[in-house]
């Protein structure tokens, strides 16, 4: 995520510098001051490579980055900071209606058999996508690889039910903007 934010900020800096050199304002949807010095000030290197980052560095860059992420629009009425926090954490974004999740893969297609990372990812997939039998890509201890962790040790992700689906769990606001009543 750091690399994505860094690349995005460099693109924005170059885009804005060209626009200002031609006498035009920068990106119309970009906030006027994404980081200290504003968009138009010369930045010799990527901001993440500098010694200290200004306050709200990630949040400010991700607001601009959100303009380019059409696949994850912030849910209506949900706090922007909570949506961006979830986006940075890499999960828990509600699925847009009428679309399928990208990780709907058959078992064993996530990586080589000796990859611990693929074993962890497959262990987190729902049981119905793995099949009723034991994992066919589970690793044999006699081959020298680590055994696949048992699903009982992993905490299942909390899925939003129909009642909860309409509200942001962090700020207790519904997507329509009303506060939850106790």
From Swiss-Prot:
<feature type="region of interest" description="Disordered">
    <location>
        <begin position="17"/>
        <end position="53"/>
    </location>
</feature>
<protein>
    <recommendedName>
        <fullName>Uncharacterized protein C16orf90</fullName>
    </recommendedName>
</protein>
<dbReference type="InterPro" id="IPR027978">
    <property type="entry name" value="DUF4644"/>
</dbReference>
<dbReference type="Pfam" id="PF15486">
    <property type="entry name" value="DUF4644"/>
</dbReference>
<feature type="compositionally biased region" description="Polar residues">
    <location>
        <begin position="42"/>
        <end position="53"/>
    </location>
</feature>
<feature type="compositionally biased region" description="Low complexity">
    <location>
        <begin position="129"/>
        <end position="138"/>
    </location>
</feature>
<feature type="region of interest" description="Disordered">
    <location>
        <begin position="128"/>
        <end position="159"/>
    </location>
</feature>
């Amino acid at each position: 995520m750091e690399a994505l934010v860094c690349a995005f900020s460099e693109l924005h800096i170059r885009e804005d510098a060209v626009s200002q050199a031609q006498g035009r304002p920068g990106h119309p949807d970009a906030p006027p001051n994404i980081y200290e010095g504003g968009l138009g000030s010369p930045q010799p290197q990527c901001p993440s490579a500098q010694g200290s980052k200004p306050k709200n560095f990630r949040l400010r860059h991700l607001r601009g980055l959100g303009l380019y992420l059409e696949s994850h629009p912030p849910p209506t009425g949900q706090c922007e900071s909570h949506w961006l926090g979830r986006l940075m954490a890499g999960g828990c974004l509600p699925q847009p209606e009428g679309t399928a999740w990208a990780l709907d893969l058959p078992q064993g297609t996530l990586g080589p058999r000796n990859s611990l990372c693929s074993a962890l990812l497959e262990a987190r997939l729902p049981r119905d996508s793995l099949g009723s039998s034991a994992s066919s890509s589970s690793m044999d201890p006699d081959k020298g690889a680590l055994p696949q962790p048992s699903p009982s040790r992993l905490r299942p992700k909390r899925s939003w039910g129909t009642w909860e689906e309409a509200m942001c769990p962090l700020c207790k606001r519904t997507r329509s903007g009303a506060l939850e009543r106790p």
